[in-house]
Amino acid sequence: MTRVVPQSGSANLVRNKAIGPRGSDPLSRLLAHLIVRGGRTTEIERATSRPWASALFEGRRHIVRLRLHGPNAAERAAAYHEGIESAEFALPGHFVADIQVDASGQDQYGPWVEISALTIADW
């Protein structure tokens, strides 16, 4: 879907500024869903979000590294691999177009999981 914002003007295109209203970053809602999926003792070690766009869509690319703690942390970390691609995430104004576990492992601090996701603005 294409939007026209008459107030933007052509100078705006040259300066490469955002055109029209922008939605909020859905990263915080996505993190909340990932923590629920991992359990109460899930810790966010790192989370980044950057703009993403194609010819037809705009959204954000997210990379999240989670650390799981507790007696069954290894089992919960392994559970991230099962069904995350088909999981439903309620993100107002956005939807998860792609999500996957990129890497996982265990070190002296316990198991960790690195996840990448692409969220698209739902116009």
Regions found by a protein language model. Give the residues of each.
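Long, contiguous binding/interaction regions
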Residues: 1-123
